Amino acid sequence: MARTKQTARKSTGGKAPRKQLATKAARKSAPATGGVKKPHRYRPGTVALREIRRYQKSTELLIRKLPFQRLVREIAQDFKTDLRFQSSAVMALQEACEAYLVGLFEDTNLCAIHAKRVTIMPKDIQLARRIRGERA
């Protein structure tokens, strides 16, 4: 019989299935608790990374407009009563606030990474603000 060349093939992965013992087969064939399927869960961090990519792509404001407007009016009450705001003024304040917060969180994340952590903590925010010169 002539010898033939063998070509490399991709394996389908895994081992060939083995026959189960009678006791294991009997246990597996019994119905599991009413056939209730567990809901699918992503591994920790997967959804967070997806959200990071999503929000980095987008340009829309992340803080809701009306709650932010109420906050602005509440803070302005301390300085002068009966102040009126143009809608464009509130939008400009919101744009500036969100840009500041995003930058602060970027610096905070760098501080956490520098400390060999992936979780940001209040001390990271304090360090970032101190390095920026915002707080003594």
Swiss-Prot record:
Residues carrying lipid (N6-decanoyllysine): K19
ADP-ribosylserine: residues carrying this PTM: S11, S29
Molecular function GO terms recorded: cadherin binding; DNA binding; protein heterodimerization activity; structural constituent of chromatin
Residues where 5-glutamyl dopamine is found: Q6
Modified residues (N6-glutaryllysine): K15, K19, K24, K28, K57, K80, K116, K123
Positions carrying N6-(beta-hydroxybutyryl)lysine: K5, K10, K15, K19, K24, K28, K57, K80, K123
Residues the record lists as N6-acetyllysine modifications: K5, K10, K15, K19, K24, K28, K37, K57, K80, K116, K123
Positions of modified residues (N6-lactoyllysine): K10, K15, K19, K24, K28, K57, K80
Residues carrying Phosphotyrosine: Y42
Protein name: Histone H3.1
Organism for this UniProt entry: Homo sapiens
